[in-house]
UniProtKB/Swiss-Prot annotation:
Residues 6-56 form the F-box domain. Pfam families: F-box (PF00646), FBA_3 (PF08268). SMART domains: FBOX. It comes from the Eukaryota. This is Putative F-box protein At3g47150. It comes from Arabidopsis thaliana. InterPro entries: F-box-assoc_dom_typ3, F-box-assoc_interact_dom, F-box-like_dom_sf, F-box_dom.
């Protein structure tokens, strides 16, 4: 570095440089790869990527990933947003400025889930993985099943991550009414129909590392379902008719669609004994008249709700299960594109910024 007429070189130890870089956001690190070959080598290394992810995921709350499918079902808008943590009260609300949003538009039909910085989506009968932070994506060859119909195929995909082996895996599910076939298995949960037992619903837990699964029965008296409703839909959580399968404090939870200002939630208290608990929650009067559906649960102990009809400005509602209060977050200018104002589907999930590269 130059100071006055003399040239003075300041030496910064490599360990200190790395520690400084580890605390920078992904956007800055992508630019700093061009500073020098040394920095590029450091930032793109496997060890640095993992250390950076561990630091950012433990020191700051996760961001939100809001995915919109356009009116024509051809493009996806992925929006990464800061996660406003507002003290819950029935009247609390806040607004996220448009400038704070990170947006990526990709060719795709549906977003399935987001896992440790990556997002799984479908595009023209193929499955793809996208890193919204680096804007990289990778498309896999079409996955085919035996004796599968060419017209209106019914395949769903989920992304899983094995932290011990540091390996991402994609699960492809053949969801034909008369069979259920798996190609790859991650640790995600969903409900399936057991052929020959239309009144029995099953929770299937998948393990990413061992690629094995186990079943747990759902008591019909707690969760009655008919055969027409017993299907999955693709999201970071799973919909079963008018009910949503969620992760509630590490336990399996099922939340029904709010109706008449209230909703019920079932939670598995003992998976081995198949013991369930049920609680009824009441929405505040300020939410009366709004038609909600459940999207997900978050680390704050809140359930994310959205209105069935997308509005501009776009708004998310958070219901606190402990205080029975609700807050709202508004995103102004988010749906300025005409094709996304009439989005067919949308989802909300956690998102952690990651440097993981999808280049092959």
């Amino acid at each position: 570095m130059k100071f006055g007429p003399n040239t003075t070189q300041i030496y910064i130890p490599l360990d200190l440089q790395i520690n400084i870089l580890l605390r920078l956001p992904v956007k800055s690190l992508l630019r700093f790869r061009c500073v020098s070959k040394l920095w590029c080598s450091i930032i793109t290394s496997h060890d640095f990527r993992n250390r950076h992810f561990n630091i950012t995921s433990s020191s700051a709350p996760p961001r939100l990933l809001i995915a919109f499918q356009d009116f024509y079902g051809e493009k996806l808008l992925l929006v990464s947003s800061p996660n406003p943590n507002v003290s819950s009260s029935s009247t609390s609300s806040c607004c996220v400025p448009y400038k704070d949003l990170s947006k990526v538009e990709i060719n795709g039909r549906k977003v399935y889930n987001a896992v440790w910085g990556l997002t799984c989506f479908e595009s023209r009968l193929k499955v793809g993985i996208c890193n919204p932070s680096t804007r990289e994506l990778h498309m896999f060859p079409q996955i085919k099943f035996k004796n599968y119909p060419d017209i209106f195929p019914c395949i769903m995909y989920f992304l899983g991550y094995d932290r011990i082996e540091d390996q991402y895996k994609v699960l492809a599910i053949d969801n034909l009414p008369w069979r259920l076939e798996y190609k790859v298995v991650p640790i995600l949960r969903a409900s399936r129909k057991d052929k020959g037992s239309p009144n029995i619903s099953i929770i299937v837990s998948f393990d990413v590392r061992s690629e094995t699964y186990k079943n747990s029965n759902v008591p019909s008296k707690l969760l009655p379902m008919d055969t027409s409703d017993n299907f999955w839909t693709a999201n970071c959580n799973c919909f079963i008719g008018d009910k949503t399968l969620i992760n509630y404090n590490g336990k399996i939870g099922v939340v029904e669609k709010p109706q008449h200002g209230r909703f019920r939630m079932w939670v598995v208290e003992d998976a081995e004994k198949e013991e369930w608990s049920m609680n009824t929650f009441y929405l505040p009067q300020s939410a009366s008249g709004l038609d909600f559906k459940v999207m997900n649960t978050f680390y704050t102990g809140e359930i994310c709700l959205v209105t069935e009809k997308i509005s501009d400005p776009f708004c998310l509602f958070y219901y606190n299960l402990k205080t029975n209060s609700m807050r709202s977050v508004t995103y102004e200018g988010l749906l300025h594109m005409a094709t996304f104002k009439q989005a067919l589907q949308f989802s909300v999930s956690y998102h952690y910024e990651s440097l993981v590269s999808l280049e092959t």
